[in-house]
Amino acid sequence: MKAEQLSDALNNLDDGILEETGKLREAHKRRGGTWKRWAAAAACLWVVARALAALPRLVRNGPDPTPTRPVHIDPSLRPLKLPESLGGGFGFEGIMLYDISELGGVSPWNEAMELTRLPVYENGSYNIAGVPVGLGEAAILERLEAAARALDTEILDTEYYYGETPTGTGPVARITAHADGMKIAAYADGGIKVSFEGGLPLPESYRFTDDATDEESEAVLYYLAQRFSKLLGFSRPQLALSGDYTFSGTFHRADAVYDGGESGVEAILNYSFRCASFISNDDGNLTMIRLEDDLACARELGEYPIITAEEARTLLLNGSYITSASYEMPGEGYVAGVELAYRNSKTDEYFLPYYRFYVELPEEARDNGLKTYGVYYVPAVWGQYIANMPVYDGGFN
């Protein structure tokens, strides 16, 4: 979906709500998952209505995911709390494809890495309302000025936007700068957004539209990563090509770029927390760059031991997962794929690794052959460090 289409439907919503909604959508699309949409406006209105919407019920104190190997509990590692709910109301996290083989944009993880520990972070931008918080005014302004320098442009004026608190106006959530032909916004959660007035034309040799092939998309993304290399700061740009279909079978791309880094763990972290997405209009012009940096205000808690993908699969089948889908996991035969990555929502108190399972939902099968794959999360951290390991009963409050 194009930025201008969203704008028409959502121009009256609070900035903080819109930012978190857009952030969630971009994050899930990057991994090949998107929020299943009923309509353009309804896709985002769940954020407004979530306090009243029916949310998936989680039954606590699920089975202890004890690894088969001996367990030594490190007292220096604090217990972690999983999010109570993953959205609800107007949709759920899933992807619509004709076949799982079309899934793209997945994590750089693979089982051959044989990872035994991964870092966990306290989310410094944690906010149950989804409003950007975390960095102070000076740090936000510093990032804004650095972005302007990277774009070789001069800031003409700035606007300050403040978050809301129960007692009134809160700290600065966003600073927006006006420059020649563009607007640059820096957020308290570390994000940067650049909007080009009227769209920035690309060389004619590049095709930057939803109906572009993977090869055409690769070419334009590498071009954009090079053109805006100072802004991105990526030493080894890697592509995450993804997208999904509408109910009628129209394909929409949702590609992104991240830094491959110097190791597999660094690649997974950058893929999950530090990535760039480029948005075009119907003419194939660049209208927006969105650069995420969710670890900008996070604090590392330590490296936690993790389970294997096979152990996670066992937990999935036993019901120890969290999901925004309104269906109980239908069974082992419907598990279509798995990847290891981090969730990066501002409504998560901790950033920890999960095994993200793509599960075919037979209830959502369509006559035109499209299948919906719901996303089911199993925490990768040993269960002994999870304070509220869940079991989802498929019901609603």
Language-model features: where?
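Disordered, charged N-terminal biogenesis/targeting segments of membrane/secreted proteins
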Residues: 1-31
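Generic recognition of cysteine residues
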Residues: 7, 35-38, 44, 275, ...
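A short, surface-exposed beta-strand/turn
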Residues: 184-201, 265-293, 363-397
